[in-house]
């Protein structure tokens, strides 16, 4: 976070080595996760962290389960407005811990481990949330606010999400113009051509929401919950304050 119009030093934000994230949105209309308000009053901004966690992450196990603690998010019921990554993460961590099978839910297990290795600093205790897996709506806002293209403008709109065959490179460059200021650009993981981010949100029993970025293609759409190994899936941790 770099408030104001300060001057860059060598193309970088002064003190950039201490940066921990980039604000995705501070629009009150998008700060809809009521559990964030209840747990800490963290309804000022959603922030994307500057590194990935995990690797080859499946969302959940096979046989597939329609998770009772999560809503099924479709385009018809407003997937783009689901800003509840924290609520969904907390619900899944609690549910899987109670069942003793969190290790079978690799994306959520990864964020749980990341919380342990990257805890909220003691000086910020109570002032920001723990890390969480972002929801479909929070990734929608990353694309709209940081990448310069709302998924609503994608030209391959389909029943399971949004896809565009050529916006990917332009959007990748735009967000990295900002992340390069703190020397933390997005990096390509899939055969040096793309990256696959897991969302917290479920679509139905066998499908979850994901971001697939294989330049020049970009998509925010549903994939099989067991797609992790095929796409070398990772989580991009978020927090709120």
Regions picked out by a protein language model, each given a short descriptive name:
Residues 43, 127-131, 137, 193-194:
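Loop/turn elements at helix/coil->beta-strand transitions in domains of secreted/extracellular proteins
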Residues 48, 133-134:
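Short hydrophobic beta-strand that contains or immediately precedes a catalytic carboxylate
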Residues 1-127, 224-241:
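Short, compositionally biased
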Residues 136-241:
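C-terminal, surface-exposed recognition/capping segments
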């Amino acid at each position: 976070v770099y408030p104001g119009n300060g001057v860059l030093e060598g193309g970088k934000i002064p003190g950039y080595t201490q940066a921990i994230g980039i604000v995705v949105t501070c629009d009150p209309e998008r700060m809809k996760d009521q559990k964030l308000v209840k747990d800490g009053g963290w309804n000022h901004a959603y922030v994307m962290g500057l590194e990935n966690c995990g690797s080859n992450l499946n969302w959940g196990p096979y046989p597939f389960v329609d998770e009772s603690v999560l809503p099924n998010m479709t385009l018809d019921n407003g997937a783009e407005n689901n800003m509840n990554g924290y609520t969904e993460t907390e619900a899944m961590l609690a549910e899987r811990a109670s069942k003793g099978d969190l290790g079978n839910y690799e994306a959520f297990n990864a964020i749980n481990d990341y919380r342990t290795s990257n805890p909220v600093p003691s000086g910020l205790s109570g002032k920001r949330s723990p890390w969480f897996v972002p929801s479909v709506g929070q990734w929608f806002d990353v694309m709209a606010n940081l990448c310069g293209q709302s998924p609503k403008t994608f030209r391959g709109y389909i029943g399971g999400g949004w896809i565009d065959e050529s916006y990917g490179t332009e959007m990748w460059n735009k967000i990295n113009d900002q992340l390069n200021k703190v020397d933390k650009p997005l990096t390509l993981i899939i055969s040096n051509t793309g990256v696959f981010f897991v969302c917290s949100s479920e679509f139905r029993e066998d499908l979850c929401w994901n971001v697939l970025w294989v330049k020049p293609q970009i998509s925010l759409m549903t994939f099989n919950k067991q797609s992790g190994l095929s796409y070398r899936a990772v989580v991009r941790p978020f927090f709120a304050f």
